Amino acid sequence: KVIGKENVLDPETTRISQVDGVLKSIGMGYKKIAVTVVSADDTIKLREVESQHPEVKIYIFVAHATEVSKEDAEVILDHADVVTGCASRYIRDIGTERGFFRAGDSIPIFGITEDGKKFLEIRIEKIGGLKEKKDAQIPKPLI
């Protein structure tokens, strides 16, 4: 399938901006938008965009959070729907401390919101349930 220039954020430079991509999607009439981000700042900006467009629901997935600071981990866990723990000590510790829905041991994935939890439950069902791992290996070191 051809995407088409009209559906690309900036066909000339092909720049990537999750926030601007979501704004473009809203401008194209989309009401339910899923977006993956890696920065705490983007989670804040996306929730601001969502608050300015009450008819739109933005589902925020955070990946590659290995080296986030404690402060950024808290921001991410305050704003995202689904977060991968990667090798992040702070995402893992704070996510566990707050009691978020969790799937997996080696690389945990947290369902932060009810929607995030539902996304994970649907995926778990599709793969036939969680499999218990004997001696699950976590990344070392956690950073």
List the predicted regions and their residue ranges:
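Conserved mixed alpha/beta catalytic, RNA-binding, or beta-rich assembly cores of soluble enzyme
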Residues: K1-I143
